[in-house]
Amino acid sequence: MSNYEAVSARSSEAVLATNKLIRNTYTLLSMTLLFSALAAALSMFMQVGPIAYYLSFGGAFLLIWLVLPRTANSAAGLGVVFAITGLLGFALGPILNMYLALSNGSQLIGMAMGGTGVIFLTLSGYALTTRKNFSFMGGFLATGVIVALIAMFANIFLAIPALSLAVSAAVIMLMSGFILYNTSSMLHQPHGNYLLMTVNLYLNIFNLFIHLLNLLTALSGRD
């Protein structure tokens, strides 16, 4: 086999691997979003309280940090991904019920869902179409997350509405950046793990929705 044929074969393999990774990731992402929505609906119907919220949220992140990295390359990893997204969906129920108690709550939730969908599809589509490598954003995004977490923790004690609004705006920008970054990773890491890719994109969407909902509520003048 000539050098040209060898390079061509490797290029074809990379393209096939990339297409498979993208297909598997978006298929699983769609399934987990649906599963998460069902879990949220169940949580809303059950009218679960704060304890269930914190347990679900905490359980999901324990799975993300301690279990998923060890199971991502096994069949068990798929179950872990659904457990994570199901728990986060269940934790979302009390939040949605809180917003639904507002006179325009259903409208705000609908706008947040629509806005989240538009942002995700636009940015992800842009990254896939242009095939740009956004890996250079990694350091900036990681730093931004640390700053946002510190600000959120501080605001638990300070309870400053303007700071909450600023944090939500910052998180929306950060999650938008992460969508570009994570989508780009699928293109430039053809042998990446689709389970990890799915969880990354799911978390981007989840956080984007939560903070967009908070921002829209603040701008609507509702407490």
Outline where the language-model segments fall.
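A hydrophobic alpha-helical transmembrane-helix feature that marks the membrane cores
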Residues: 1-223
